[in-house]
Amino acid sequence: MTLRILLLLHPTVVSDQNLVESVKSKISAEHPNHSLDQQIINRITQGDVVLSNNTYDEIHYINPNDSQYLEMPILLIKLLNDLLTHDGVLRGDLPKDQNLDALMQGFVVGDDGSWIKPKPVETVLLLKKKKESNITSNSNNNDSSPREVGVNNTGNYTHAAMSTLASKKKIPMFKKLLDRSNEVKGNLASGTVKSPSPGLTDTSAQNTDEENENGNSMKRKLVETKLTYFSDSDSDNNEGRDLDDDDDDGQEDNDIYINENDLISELKSDNLIIPKKCELPQWGKGAERHVRTVRVGLKGVVKEAGAFRRQSG
């Protein structure tokens, strides 16, 4: 099989013809049966020469410059990767500090510093096998052998049979809470049970007479202990209060409500500055006298003006 090799030359290699010949002789010694193509790298990058992809088994790059001038553009690395076949090798004067760029473009860095284009790895999907459920009492497939309900001849469950099994399943039953409460009340009335066991309570049910009596007694205790502020409403406070004389009611009203005058006196005693009420000035006798004087003065001026006109006319 003929090995196709591309000899890629840097433009500055023309200054050393012996270098190119030595590389060619080395290639001939290593690969007796080969086909060699020689190109200048600038002609490939500029598009003057178009090479086919996946064509060359090896590419030898010759760059006689120093190591600091061996840098390759990313597009050139990608182009060389496209020209190589799978398991193709790029050898020669390669930059040592661009191994990461080569990896990003699909190369694998070899032990000798060469860049290798690996074969694409085929993705293999492992499919899990379905487990066949065989719920039969006998290993053979005789029709006369007993089978469970819901299993066909192949030993698999059927949809219709599964729905039949679901319909035959017993639904759990729950006892109503109302019946339980009535049962507890009956036991308490008969004296068979001392106290009901703790359980769920129905908050939507109406309060019993016993609960109402307990609530009234609690309200009375609150009134007696002067804790009426914790009652539900003002009407509840009045229900537990005894009827007293009118004098007591008046005294309680005085304790509850405060007079406006008392409030003002307390503010004055606290040395608070109360702004003075704004009042409009009232017209007095002095103001009327001033207006009268102005009117008299105007009349005199008018008379003098009339006399002056008559004299001048």
UniProtKB/Swiss-Prot annotation:
InterPro entries, per database record: Dre2_N (IPR031838)
Keywords, in A-Z order: Cytoplasm, Iron, Iron-sulfur, Metal-binding, Mitochondrion
UniProt superkingdom: Eukaryota
Keyword Cytoplasm (UniProt): yes
Location of region: Disordered: 134-155, 187-254, 271-313
Signal peptide interval: none
Compositional bias of kind Acidic residues: 233-254
Domain notes: The C-terminal domain binds 2 Fe-S clusters but is otherwise mostly in an intrinsically disordered conformation.
Family under the similarity heading: Belongs to the anamorsin family.
Name this polypeptide is given: Fe-S cluster assembly protein DRE2
Organism: Lodderomyces elongisporus (strain ATCC 11503 / CBS 2605 / JCM 1781 / NBRC 1676 / NRRL YB-4239)
Classification lineage: Eukaryota, Fungi, Dikarya, Ascomycota, Saccharomycotina
Gene: DRE2
